[in-house]
Amino acid sequence: MELKEIMSCAVNGEIRAIGAGSGRAAWLLSDGAVMSLDCGTGAVVMTFDTAEEVNYDDGGFDANAPSAVYVKDGYTAVVNRFGRHGWVSSDDDDWRIRLMRDSYQIAHTDYPMGFFRRDGKVHMIFGEAWNHVQIADLTARRVLTAAKSRVTEGAEERHIAYYRDHEEANKLLWPSEYDYFYGRIRVSPDGAHFLSCGWVWGAFDALVAYETGDFIENPRIRESVVFAGEHMSRNGCFCGNDAVAVPVKPDIDDYGYDGGDEIPWEVRLYSLDGEELAAVSLPGMNLAKAYLASVNGLVYLWGSEFGFAAVDFRSGEVVYRDEEFCPAAFDEDNGWFVTAEDGVIGIWTME
């Protein structure tokens, strides 16, 4: 296996964030412009500008804050990762829509955002509050989950069962709202499930899966906890449609401290109901801030502290390692990696 660069493009301006999908790379510049590269033709165009004349108490969208860019089939979204603001734009229909979420605990919570296809149309998952995400049909610009409750399925039954054996000291109204902070969103290749890499008070990392069709149609929230850990991992990716790869440090204690390098990080494979299916040990690689993606049965991991690795759960081996290569984005639709270094964007493939 080897990495091969298939295209490069010089960029004018300072790149603040970059994303890729559906054969396009899109990036946010420090002046607020969002540009895109057609990886087939090499054409570069300005997609839209995040600048606006409206004044916000918090300053509005900040092009120089940590941000993320998402691309899917003619749609581009850009959000401040730990802020309130974002935008989604349609390349074909020439519109852009402002996004804004509630400010509660946003400094610790990645802006939930993701695209998927359903019934031939692109849909968007986006956060509105810490425990509330919506799903919209972008073709119709219609929010499909406008009537969805923030209460989980079976909440009343669990409340009654719990207080059969416990004193109800606080006398609060029930059922209570969903007690979960949605985080970074990942979507399965078939669009049937999405994963939230979020957290719950404790604070514990919690990777939770949802069926997209059920989330749209069910008035209550039905969740499946894939993984929970103590300050360990708020990242993961689908490996196929029915499993999730998660970086795990086995010896992290209840306070978020680990035993150093003696016990290495692992990348584990979990079913959507939380059953551990496989694990591969990765000595010498600190995966605390790793990014993960998967295609063709391989899981790719990269980060500034260790470079790049490809893991095959079928053989239980690291099948490729490069300490110098560190992508800035990944096109899951085509299996392309995107680098952004020294004013040049590169498109790479693994062969």
Question: Which functions belong to the PLM regions below?
Answer:
Residues 1-10, 32-58, 80-107, 134-173, ...:
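Surface-exposed loop/turn elements that mediate protein-protein interactions on large endomembrane-trafficking
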Residues 10-20, 53-73, 104-117, 180-185, ...:
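Repeated scaffold domains used in trafficking and secretory/extracellular systems
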Residues 12-17, 24, 33-38, 76-79, ...:
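Flexible "stalk/tail and boundary" regions
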Residues 23-30, 67-81, 86-87, 120-128, ...:
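Short beta-strand elements that form the blades of beta-propeller/WD-repeat-like
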Residues 110-115, 121-135, 141, 145:
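Long, hydrophobic, well-ordered secondary-structure blocks that form the structural core
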Residues 127-129, 163, 169, 173-216, ...:
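Short, solvent-exposed linear motifs at loop/edge-of-secondary-structure regions
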Residues 198-207, 228-277, 287:
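Beta-propeller domains
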Residues 329-351:
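Blade-level signature of beta-propeller repeat domains, shared across WD40, Kelch, NHL, RCC1
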